[in-house]
């Protein structure tokens, strides 16, 4: 059985949905409190969304200082998959485990909506069950989700997901938070650490209005098994 650690911080609030999605994909999720640590026996690590430490200073800044981030860094260096969703992506960015940073949305407002994403890479542990340029539908819910990188052309190979229209067109019309290049999911240079602002765990069953996110977790579990 593929063991997946779901990390909990004060203010985490998407952990149950994340564990449920991992189970649907055939994995064995286990909650790990950030102060407890102990990730050696896990095949993959997930940092779910929420508002860790109330988003004080800025989203993810305090959580990124937790000692468990050093364990997560070691997991990444070992080649194990690490996924950070929404606040999890913010934490990964603060810990410099993925390129770029997240800042407040254009308009300085919280955005909660369904969006379309274009899959840019299918060679990561998280996207093998998608097709390149496939359009998927998942929700977003964040206030500080605008991705920024000073020279985005330098990280073209790191981009995994972009905001797009239903036909796959990338334009500012569909870029709800103002992210540079419509980027909303990136990996590290090794491809095994993914940060993404949209919530695939909230689109893991047809009863949730979309099951497009389930394949991300199926990709993860299958990759770990192989």
Swiss-Prot record:
Active site per the UniProt annotation: 86, 199, 201
Highest taxon of the lineage: Archaea
DNA-binding keyword on record: no
Main location: cytoplasm
Subcellular location(s) of the protein: Cytoplasm
Catalytic activity entry: N(2)-formyl-N(1)-(5-phospho-beta-D-ribosyl)glycinamide + L-glutamine + ATP + H2O = 2-formamido-N(1)-(5-O-phospho-beta-D-ribosyl)acetamidine + L-glutamate + ADP + phosphate + H(+); L-glutamine + H2O = L-glutamate + NH4(+)
EC assignment: 6.3.5.3, 3.5.1.2
Residues spanning the signal sequence: none
InterPro entries linked: Class_I_gatase-like, PRibForGlyAmidine_synth_PurQ
Pathway participation: Purine metabolism; IMP biosynthesis via de novo pathway; 5-amino-1-(5-phospho-D-ribosyl)imidazole from N(2)-formyl-N(1)-(5-phospho-D-ribosyl)glycinamide: step 1/2
Limits of the Glutamine amidotransferase type-1 domain: 3-226
The keyword Cytoplasm is assigned to this record: yes
PROSITE patterns: GATASE_TYPE_1
Protein's GO biological process: 'de novo' IMP biosynthetic process
UniProt GO cellular component terms: cytoplasm
Self-association and partners: Part of the FGAM synthase complex composed of 1 PurL, 1 PurQ and 2 PurS subunits.
Cited function: Part of the phosphoribosylformylglycinamidine synthase complex involved in the purines biosynthetic pathway. Catalyzes the ATP-dependent conversion of formylglycinamide ribonucleotide (FGAR) and glutamine to yield formylglycinamidine ribonucleotide (FGAM) and glutamate. The FGAM synthase complex is composed of three subunits. PurQ produces an ammonia molecule by converting glutamine to glutamate. PurL transfers the ammonia molecule to FGAR to form FGAM in an ATP-dependent manner.
HAMAP family: PurQ
Protein name: Phosphoribosylformylglycinamidine synthase subunit PurQ
Lineage: Archaea, Methanobacteriati, Methanobacteriota, Methanomada group, Methanopyri
């Amino acid at each position: 059985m593929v063991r997946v650690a779901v990390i909990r911080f004060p203010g985490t609030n998407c952990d149950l949905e994340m564990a449920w999605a991992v189970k649907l994909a055939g994995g064995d999720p286990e909650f790990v409190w950030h102060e407890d640590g102990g990730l050696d026996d896990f095949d993959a690590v997930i940092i779910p969304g929420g508002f860790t430490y109330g988003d004080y200073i800025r989203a993810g800044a305090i959580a990124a200082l937790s000692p468990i981030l050093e364990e997560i860094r070691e997991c990444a260096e070992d080649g194990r998959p690490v996924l950070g969703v929404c606040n999890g992506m913010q934490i990964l960015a603060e810990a410099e485990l993925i390129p770029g940073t997240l800042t407040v949305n254009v308009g300085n407002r919280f955005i909660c909506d369904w969006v379309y994403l274009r899959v840019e890479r299918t060679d990561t542990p998280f996207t093998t069950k998608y097709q390149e340029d496939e359009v998927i539908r998942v929700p977003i819910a964040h206030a500080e989700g605008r991705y920024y990188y000073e020279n985005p052309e330098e990280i073209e190979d790191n981009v995994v997901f972009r905001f797009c229209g239903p036909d796959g067109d990338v334009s500012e019309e569909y870029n709800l938070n103002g992210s540079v290049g419509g980027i909303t999911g990136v990996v590290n240079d090794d491809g095994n650490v993914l940060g993404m602002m949209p919530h695939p765990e909230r689109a893991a069953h047809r009863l949730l209005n979309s099951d497009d996110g389930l394949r991300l977790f199926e990709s993860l579990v299958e990759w770990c098994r192989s």
